């Protein structure tokens, strides 16, 4: 139950601010930097990537 709750919160954060959700899940790794770059190019690609990375 707690793991699914954490994933749900991470997904909500990923929708509001994609790099923040990825940062809380993976720290300052390559996933964060890719998400940050995609968010700068467009908000929607950042959201899609963040949700995909968090749920995989």
UniProtKB/Swiss-Prot annotation:
One of its GO terms (biological process) is response to water deprivation. InterPro entries: PMP3. Induction: Early induction by low temperature and abscisic acid (ABA). Late induction by drought and salt stresses. GO terms for cellular component: membrane. Its main location: membrane. Plays a role in the regulation of membrane potential. Could mediate a proton leak. This is Hydrophobic protein LTI6A.
């Amino acid at each position: 139950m707690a793991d699914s709750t954490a994933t749900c919160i991470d997904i909500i954060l990923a929708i509001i601010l994609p790099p923040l959700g990825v940062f809380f899940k993976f720290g300052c790794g390559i996933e964060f930097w890719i998400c940050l770059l995609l968010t700068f190019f467009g908000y929607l690609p950042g959201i899609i990537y963040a949700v995909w990375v968090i749920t995989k």
